């Protein structure tokens, strides 16, 4: 069941890739993918290329995939291990969602952080109290870790 669904999503992604994202299996393992997300142009992550790993559980799509950043990101909803605080990867997951929709949600999270549900409270605090400092720090991390 899971592998059939994953194959279908892969075909759909190749046919109609979401803007500024790409994803596909690592080697021969259909349950382990790597994705690339381009930093959205209207965000401090612009110009960055962010690598993301995707692990599908055996009972996918009834359980959400495990998605994590491999590239370091300065963001209130992404911690230093690359974990992402995104409702659709947890309690709001639905089998109707696809990897394509997950990647687009991560892109919009980069543009619009959710400081009220932070994974990194210090960054959320900075975002709320000193947005310029947040944006310049996020930009410098992007240049340091996500470019070249």
Curated annotation (Swiss-Prot):
Quaternary assembly: Interacts with CHIP and the E3 ubiquitin ligase BB. Associates with the E3 ubiquitin ligase JMJ24.
InterPro entries reported in the protein's UniProt record: UBQ-conjugat_E2_core (IPR000608), UBQ-conjugating_AS (IPR023313), UBQ-conjugating_enzyme/RWD (IPR016135)
Domain of life: Eukaryota
Domain UBC core: 1-147
Protein family: Belongs to the ubiquitin-conjugating enzyme family.
Pathway assignment: Protein modification; protein ubiquitination
Protein name: Ubiquitin-conjugating enzyme E2 10
Catalysed reaction equations from the record: S-ubiquitinyl-[E1 ubiquitin-activating enzyme]-L-cysteine + [E2 ubiquitin-conjugating enzyme]-L-cysteine = [E1 ubiquitin-activating enzyme]-L-cysteine + S-ubiquitinyl-[E2 ubiquitin-conjugating enzyme]-L-cysteine
GO biological process, one term: protein ubiquitination
GO molecular function, one term: ubiquitin protein ligase binding
Primary role: Accepts the ubiquitin from the E1 complex and catalyzes its covalent attachment to other proteins. Mediates the selective degradation of short-lived and abnormal proteins.
Keyword terms: ATP-binding, Nucleotide-binding, Transferase, Ubl conjugation pathway
EC number: 2.3.2.23
Organism, scientific name: Arabidopsis thaliana
Pfam families per record: UQ_con
Tissue-specific expression: Ubiquitously expressed with the highest levels in rosette leaves, roots and petals.
Active-site residues annotated for this sequence: 85 (glycyl thioester intermediate)
């Amino acid at each position: 069941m899971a592998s059939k669904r994953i194959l279908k999503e892969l075909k759909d992604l190749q046919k109609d890739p979401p803007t500024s994202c790409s994803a596909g299996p690592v080697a021969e393992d259909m349950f382990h993918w790597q994705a690339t997300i381009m930093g959205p142009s209207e965000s401090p992550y612009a110009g960055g290329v962010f690598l993301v790993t995707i692990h599908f559980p055996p009972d996918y799509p009834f359980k959400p995939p495990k998605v994590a950043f491999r590239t370091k990101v300065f963001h209130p909803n992404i911690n230093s291990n690359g974990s992402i605080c995104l409702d659709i990867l947890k309690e709001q997951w639905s089998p109707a969602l696809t990897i394509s929709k997950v990647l687009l949600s991560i892109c919009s999270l980069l543009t619009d952080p959710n400081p009220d549900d932070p994974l990194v409270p210090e960054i959320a605090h900075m975002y709320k109290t000193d947005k310029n400092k947040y944006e310049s720090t996020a930009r410098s991390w992007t240049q340091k870790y996500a470019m070249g």
